[in-house]
């Protein structure tokens, strides 16, 4: 069930992003979403992930990813550096959500933020 919900989220995000966009995925994990966007939408993708192990997996998929803490490392990006910045089910893991949200609105022309549902209703 969890995988199905996650894939639905990927489909929703993929449908929003035009072909050839420049995309930054914050909390990119193993790079699965960026790999999917590259395959389906021919995007230029970059990922930031705090876990060195996940960065290694992303790199093995051919996804450009670097290890960094998004609570600290977004100020280096120039204004409107990306067409889209994605924060997919990651905001709850940040220590400074206000900073992160301000920064993604600065560095992305458009932003996509999703939140996990920690208490889904039964039967939906």
Language model regions located:
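Class I SAM-dependent methyltransferase SAM/SAH-binding core
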Residues: 36-73
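A short glycine-rich, Lys/Arg-flanked "PGG" loop and its adjoining helix->strand segment in the class I
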Residues: 98-112
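Class I SAM-dependent methyltransferase "Motif I" SAM/SAH-binding loop
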Residues: 27-29
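Conserved class I S-adenosyl-L-methionine
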Residues: 113-124
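Short conserved loop adjoining the S-adenosyl-L-methionine
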Residues: 73-79
